């Protein structure tokens, strides 16, 4: 049985790998566009999830699990930005 902590650790690893590849693009976009930036990114992921729930993925690395993990990471990054902005 997978635990919450295992998933959180996996999300941390995913974030670190993607951040190494893409740099800190999320924070840069957030600085420039505010909450609009994560809303658009999350909306794109939710649309992908809706599509994947209706049909099999044509792209190998776009599974439902990958998409849900991306949504979770974007939610956490948004929370980090909000908390850092508020000084919490």
Labelled PLM ranges:
Residues 1-88:
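Intrinsically disordered, low-complexity regulatory regions
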């Amino acid at each position: 049985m997978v635990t919450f902590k295992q998933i959180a650790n996996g999300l941390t690893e995913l974030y670190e790998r993607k951040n190494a590849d893409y740099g800190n693009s999320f924070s840069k976009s957030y600085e420039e566009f505010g909450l609009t930036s994560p809303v658009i990114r999350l909306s794109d992921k939710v649309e992908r999830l809706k599509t994947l729930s209706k049909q099999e993925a044509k792209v190998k690395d776009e599974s439902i699990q990958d998409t849900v993990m991306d949504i979770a990471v974007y939610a956490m990054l948004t929370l980090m930005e909000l908390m850092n902005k508020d000084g919490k």
